[in-house]
């Protein structure tokens, strides 16, 4: 995938990240941040708390006009949204299909 004037983007990392998140959910590892987040006693509320926190940090980074920080916070937010999808038992493929549908 490319955007005019930008270098190509390899989206395989998204598939790989989703696979790791699903693996951590199915086979928890006490040394894994993702596993601990998914196993937290607060349940999905803990995951959603992180989504809210990362959303706020992303908004502030954009508002402050700091591209590097915006990139970091976008990655954090995207990761936590993926974890929330897994915690809610929503498959990423459904989200991708919905994006494709909306693109038409």
From Swiss-Prot:
The record's subcellular location field reads: Cytoplasm
Keyword presence, Chloroplast: no
Q: Which CDD domains match?
A: NTP-PPase_HisIE_like
**The enzyme's E.C. designation:** 3.6.1.31
Q: Which reaction does it catalyse?
A: 1-(5-phospho-beta-D-ribosyl)-ATP + H2O = 1-(5-phospho-beta-D-ribosyl)-5'-AMP + diphosphate + H(+)
NCBIfam families reported in the protein's UniProt record:
histidine_hisI (TIGR03188)
Name of protein: Phosphoribosyl-ATP pyrophosphatase
What is an example of a Pfam family matching this protein?
Answer: PRA-PH
Species in which this protein is naturally found? Methanoregula boonei (strain DSM 21154 / JCM 14090 / 6A8)
Q: Which SUPFAM superfamilies match?
A: all-alpha NTP pyrophosphatases
Q: Which family does it belong to?
A: Belongs to the PRA-PH family.
Offer one example of a GO biological process linked to this entry. L-histidine biosynthetic process
One MF annotation (Gene Ontology) recorded for this entry: ATP binding
């Amino acid at each position: 995938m490319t955007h005019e004037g930008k270098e190509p983007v390899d989206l395989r990392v998204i598939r790989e990240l989703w696979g790791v998140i699903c693996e951590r959910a199915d086979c928890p590892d006490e040394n894994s941040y993702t596993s601990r987040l998914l196993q937290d006693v607060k349940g999905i509320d803990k995951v959603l708390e992180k989504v809210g926190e990362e959303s706020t940090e992303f908004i502030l980074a954009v508002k402050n006009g700091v591209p590097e920080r915006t990139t970091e916070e976008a990655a954090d937010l995207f990761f936590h949204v993926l974890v929330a999808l897994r915690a809610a038992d929503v498959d990423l493929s459904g989200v991708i299909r919905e994006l494709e549908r909306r693109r038409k």
